[in-house]
Each structure stands twice: as C-alpha cells, then as structure tokens.
A protein has these predicted regions:
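C-terminal cap/substrate-recognition subdomain and adjoining C-terminal extension
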Residues: 1-119
Length: 119
C-alpha cells in the first residue's frame, strides 16, 4: 500500500506505469472549466491513521518515509525507516533508522519482516 500526500489526479500516470498499485492519497476538486478549485484531504494525518487501521485488522506494518509528514506514520508502524531523507530530518528524528538506497531499504524490510522474504 502506498500512503502519499499527493493527489490522485497527479499520481494517476505513475500508478498506471506501476500496474495500478493501491495508493491512498488526496483528491483535487475542479470547476466547470477543469481548473483546480479546491482540494479534499482523505483525513488529517492520513498516513498514521492508515497504519492504525491496518493494526486494527491485525496487520504488522513496516513503513518508510523521507520527510516530516511521514514521521507520525513511522512512529505508529511496527518498524519505521527514514529512506533517503534530508540530513535535518534524520537529525531531528534519530529514533528512526536512516536508510540510503533501494538495496539497503530492501534489506531493512527483510530484516524487519516476520516472513522469510527472499533476497
């Protein structure tokens, strides 16, 4: 599941290229001319709320994020990682391991998982 603070309208082309993975994000509202008139947030702090909901369904959650808006999600997850985050975010949130690069992220996910994920 991808939890993003983008908008469906912006994410659509990339999600198509990725084969339509599940993404939870926000929605833009347009006027009769097709111009952006407003936005609708899924809910406040939607990433953390999604993790809480997954926990309520008895799922374990491994999360990765790169910015301030991800930190409440990372704190709610069973395992949370900062992925290629800026140095100031890493310094402010030392409780989250800082991971650099996709191979290191895959290894961190494998190590955090209770399943045997092949390398």
């Amino acid at each position: 599941i991808i939890l993003s603070d983008t908008f469906y309208e912006f994410a659509h082309p990339l999600m198509k290229q990725l084969g339509w993975p599940t993404i939870f994000c926000h929605k833009l509202e347009t006027d009769e001319k097709g111009m952006i008139a407003a936005y609708k947030l899924r809910q406040p702090d939607q990433k953390r709320q999604a993790v809480k909901a997954l926990h309520g369904l008895n799922f374990r959650v491994i999360a990765a994020g790169d910015s301030y808006n991800d930190t409440t999600m990372l704190g709610e997850a069973d395992h949370g990682f900062l992925f290629d985050a800026p140095e100031n975010v890493i310094a402010e949130f030392p409780q989250f391991p800082a991971i650099h690069g996709y191979e290191a992220l895959k290894e961190a996910i494998r190590n955090a998982s209770v399943r045997d994920i092949p390398a």
